[in-house]
Amino acid sequence: MEEFQGYLELDRYQQHDFLYPLIFREYIYALAHDHGLNRSILLDNVGYDTKYSLLIIKRLISRMYQQNHLIISANDSNQNKFFGYNKNLYSQMMSEGFAVIVEIPFSLRLVSSLEATEIVKSYNLRSIHSIFPFLEDKFPHLNYVSDVLIPYPIHLEILVQTLRYWVKDPSSLHLLRLLLHEYYNWNSLITTKKVIFSKSNPRLFLLLYNSHVCEYESILLFLRNQSSHLRLTSSGIFFERIHFYEKKKYPVEEVFVNDFPAAILWFFKDPFMHYVRYQGKSILSSKDTPLLMNKWKYYLVNLWQCHSYVWSQPGRIYINQLSKHSLDFLGYFSSMRPNLSVVRSQMLENSFLMDNAMKKLDTLVPIIPLIGSLAKVKFCNALGHPISKSTWADSSDFDIIDRFVHICRNLSHYYSGSSRKKSLYRIKYILRLSCVKTLARKHKSTVRTFLKRLGYKLLDEFFTEEEQILSLIFPRASYTLKKFYRGRIWYLDIFCINDLVNHE
């Protein structure tokens, strides 16, 4: 996008919240859809000045388009045509281009917001693992937790109305409605969680969904700002993970004042709550009593239904005691367990013992769902016994080992924050033995014979980089090293949860 800034003067249009005139140029959508475009032509000195001109932009795009012809395969010949083009492909190109254009002002606001708050390493805040240190720090002081699924809008028009807060161009909104109607299956996308976050989902719909979530979370942001206990920068950052930084607060405050009397606002005077979200699932936790938590639930549901026009049922939001409830969140089973410690104190001739009970967040590997996932892709059976991967037997030995090592290291990397490593070691054992059985099947040999011939050094490939470095530093496993292996490690370079065999 930096290549276009000199020609489009984005700052001038950002001030007026208008999309620049390229929104209605057909060429930009074809270029946005084609990921194989040769970008080197943008680096050439074409001799254009920086003065804004539609003619200059059109000539520039025309020159780019001449090297990138649209080819429609013969397989699409039986589908509906639109002015000589495939209708579905044409609509998809339009949506991709529209999403790219709308994202530019948000990206500029993101950069300016990071510079204003002096956030240097903002990419660390995008990591999934950055949520767990926050939970470790806050959850031991809380009492109740509630799992909340993000409610979906009751109609696609709600998504358009939400985007209207940032896009003040009526023509662009009409074009957006046209694109929504072109996708005949988008109504099913609203109610299907797996399809929303699939890799094949249009980029435009993800943008609209994020704007909808921003509107939904603005109520919680208002409550957070009313609390004197949540003035830390760390908790505020997590509300900014959705990349909509300049959401105005007065619509939410106005709703509170108009829809609720002053007596009800007393319940929100000092809520002391925490909120985290990933994709369509969120966690709301607080230190209040069960009575206040239930009042929160009904008030928030009414606000979401009346203000954001989303359908949410109070009966599907369960409030659980944190000490007796296990959270299934981001692939971990998280729960609070007491950590007992005995302190011996002596004063003059008298000595006594003091028992300290501290709460600690316990993160466990979900062993049964993981074994089910491994069994689904034929690494083991339903009981967890390793089997050979028959579909990989035709590959080379190097490719087979590399695939297994890649999956094993990814799982070790992601579940390095587990409190108990026994379940993780079992998953590693399944993958190692499945790899050996696959190689033995390829060479028509038994596992024992194959290991004797190749040696047990094959299994060393499955060690992670951290384990290899520690084994070089500490040749003999000491007590300190074993204790370090049992400790939790959170990485700040994990941005998404991939499938087990997404590279297959």
Curated annotation (Swiss-Prot):
The domain of life for this entry's organism is Eukaryota
Q: What is its main location?
A: plastid
Any idea which GO molecular function terms this record carries? Answer: RNA binding
Cysteine pairs forming cystine bridges in this chain are none
Keywords (A to Z) from UniProt: Chloroplast, mRNA processing, Plastid, RNA-binding, tRNA processing
Q: Where are the transmembrane segments?
A: none
A GO cellular component term found in this entry reads:
chloroplast
Q: Where in the cell is it found?
A: Plastid, Chloroplast
Q: Name one GO biological process term.
A: tRNA processing
Q: Which InterPro entries match?
A: Domain_X, Maturase_MatK, Maturase_MatK_N
Query: What family is this?
Result: Belongs to the intron maturase 2 family. MatK subfamily.
Query: In UniProt terms, what function does this protein have?
Result: Usually encoded in the trnK tRNA gene intron. Probably assists in splicing its own and other chloroplast group II introns.
Q: What is this protein called?
A: Maturase K
| Source species of the chain | Vauquelinia californica (Arizona rosewood)
